[in-house]
């Protein structure tokens, strides 16, 4: 009996060892194939990245993928292999070959496993393609066009003026305010009113709405689930992704659903972004030209998230760079204060003449892009060519914004904040900079729909702030402030800033042009702010 038990145990041991041996041979063969025989074998990159996704997964999990990818580019060149089936690019040719819309050429689709998914599966403008994507764009194109935004100028200006009056209160008392939080609140108030004619009054109340608090954690949750989805392990996500992140995502969709359900009841007569969606989507999209209710929920999440955080990232980054570059700050302040004689002259059209402000915003996006690591594409069926190499179907392809920005072959003094490089007639030092490598809102049919809103709102906010106030960074600002984690978007650190009344603020107070002490700008009816006199 004992002998037969021993034989059974021996047989089990041999089976396990045999299986382990088979797996080891298979794994060694796979490693050998990925390094030496794979279609991407000749693309340079770290050895471990050629046969394992462990580095990529770790960088993604820790929020350091953009920074580490840039380091790989600095060492290995413009085209690098950062995973067995993942490539990253920093050259002009890749923008044209992968992202540009060229007649007669198949569009490179978004990578199916690296795009956000709705809670219940519906697609959003972030992850659609072809006619499906075109349907989303048609519904929102006019709203986000320059003409559409000008039609909403009074509404946009109203919330910016409330913010200006709040800043005045801080300036008069010498208190610092965290512009990271306040810029998000301004963007959130604007997009909520544009989207649903239902403002959250975050700036007026000085409080972050609960919905806003879910976005950073939702971004983290989304990026982590990419890792599980790619490996067919989504069934493990509920157990391994922190519950705090999962609850944030659920709450994000809960708030969106509540807004959508309320907005459906009012129909398409409110004059906001949602009017056209409401009309075309009647009867749960019976016409096929609108959105189903579930698609509306996903669209609402996308609209609010990108409409507030994209703008706040751009403005917060610019505030940091201005605060750490006094010479640039002075040049921008001089441009703004010599361009306008009164606040009534500052509007969505007039701010476009500010060349140096435009250059400052472009330089901010070069060094601190509002959206990062969200451009994954994959070749069309049968594979495709990009940057002179054949890329097999199923390969993940991305542009490294940091790799582009930090490349001295593209930009002179690449790590320095130099807005002059983006002036229409730049100094000789910057005339050889490669602006064709710079596309912060992506390129082609899937470029960022909200870029006009981000540019317009950012210009208007910064112009009004610097027309009235001087500012400086609080002494408590982290010297490594730019070193931030990112999960599709940056997880921004606090940026405390001290504002001081400038000459225009003092002059307006002396002339009695003030705002009410409750923080409402007297000029709301015509869209212009007044400084508080009390």
Curated annotation (Swiss-Prot):
Keyword Oxidoreductase: yes
Keywords assigned by UniProt, alphabetized: Heme, Iron, Metal-binding, Monooxygenase, Oxidoreductase
Pfam families recorded: p450
Name of protein: Cytochrome P450 monooxygenase vrtK
PANTHER family listed in its UniProt record: BENZOATE-PARA-HYDROXYLASE, CYTOCHROME P450
GO MF entries: heme binding; iron ion binding; monooxygenase activity; oxidoreductase activity, acting on paired donors, with incorporation or reduction of molecular oxygen
Cited function: Cytochrome P450 monooxygenase; part of the gene cluster that mediates the biosynthesis of viridicatumtoxin, a tetracycline-like fungal meroterpenoid with a unique, fused spirobicyclic ring system. The first step of the pathway is the production of the malonamoyl-CoA starter unit for the polyketide synthase vrtA. The aldolase vrtJ may be involved in the synthesis of the malonamate substrate for malonamoyl-CoA synthetase vrtB.
Disruption phenotype: Impairs the production of viridicatumtoxin, but accumulates previridicatumtoxin.
Keyword Metal-binding set for record: yes
């Amino acid at each position: 009996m004992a002998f037969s038990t021993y034989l059974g145990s021996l047989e089990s041991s041999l089976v396990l060892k045999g299986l382990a041996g088979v797996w080891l041979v298979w794994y060694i063969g796979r490693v050998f194939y990925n390094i030496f025989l794979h279609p991407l074998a000749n693309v340079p990159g770290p050895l471990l990245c050629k046969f394992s996704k462990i580095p990529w997964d770790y960088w993604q999990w820790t929020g350091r993928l953009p920074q580490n990818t840039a380091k790989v580019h600095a060492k290995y060149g413009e085209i690098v292999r950062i995973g067995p089936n993942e490539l990253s690019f920093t050259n002009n040719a890749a923008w044209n070959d992968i992202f540009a819309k060229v007649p007669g050429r198949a569009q490179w689709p978004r990578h199916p496993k690296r795009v956000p998914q709705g809670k219940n599966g519906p697609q959003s403008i972030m992850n659609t393609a072809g006619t499906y994507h075109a349907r989303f764009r048609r519904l929102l194109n006019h709203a986000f066009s320059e003409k559409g935004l000008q039609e909403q100028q009074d509404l946009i200006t109203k919330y910016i003026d409330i913010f200006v009056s709040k800043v005045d209160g801080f300036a008069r008392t010498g208190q610092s305010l965290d512009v990271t939080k306040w810029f998000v609140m301004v963007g959130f108030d604007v997009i909520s009113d544009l989207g649903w004619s239902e403002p959250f009054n975050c700036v007026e109340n000085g409080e972050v709405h609960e919905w806003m608090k879910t976005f950073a954690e939702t971004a983290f949750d989304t990026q982590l689930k990419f890792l599980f989805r790619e490996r067919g392990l989504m069934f493990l996500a509920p157990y391994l992704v922190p519950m705090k992140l999962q609850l944030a995502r659920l709450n994000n969709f809960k708030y969106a659903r509540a807004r959508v359900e309320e907005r459906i009841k009012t129909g398409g007569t409110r004059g906001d972004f949602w009017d056209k969606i409401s009309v075309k989507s009647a009867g749960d999209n019976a016409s096929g030209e609108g959105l189903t209710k579930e698609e509306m929920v996903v669209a609402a999440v996308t609209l609010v998230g990108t409409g507030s955080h994209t703008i706040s990232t751009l403005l917060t980054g610019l505030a940091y760079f201005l605060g750490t570059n006094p010479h640039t700050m002075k040049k921008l302040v001089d441009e703004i204060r010599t361009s306008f004689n009164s606040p009534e002259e500052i509007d969505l059209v007039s701010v476009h003449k500010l060349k140096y402000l435009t250059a400052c915003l472009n330089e901010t996006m070069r060094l601190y892009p509002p959206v990062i690591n969200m451009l994954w594409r994959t070749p069309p069926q049968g594979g495709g060519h990009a940057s002179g190499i054949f890329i097999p179907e199923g390969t993940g392809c991305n542009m490294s914004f940091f790799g582009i920005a930090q490349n001295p072959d593209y930009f002179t003094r690449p790590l320095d904040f130099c807005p002059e490089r983006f002036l229409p007639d730049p100094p000789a030092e910057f005339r050889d900079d490669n602006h064709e490598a710079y596309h912060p809102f992506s390129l082609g049919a899937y470029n960022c729909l909200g870029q006009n809103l981000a540019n317009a709102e950012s210009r208007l906010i910064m112009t009004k702030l610097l027309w009235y106030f001087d500012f400086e960074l609080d002494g408590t600002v982290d010297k490594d402030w730019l070193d931030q984690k990112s999960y599709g978007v940056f997880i921004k650190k606090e940026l405390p800033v001290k504002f001081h009344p400038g000459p225009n603020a003092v002059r307006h107070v002396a002339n009695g042009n003030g705002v009410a002490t409750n923080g409402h700008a007297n000029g709301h009816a015509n869209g212009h702010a007044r400084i508080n006199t009390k």
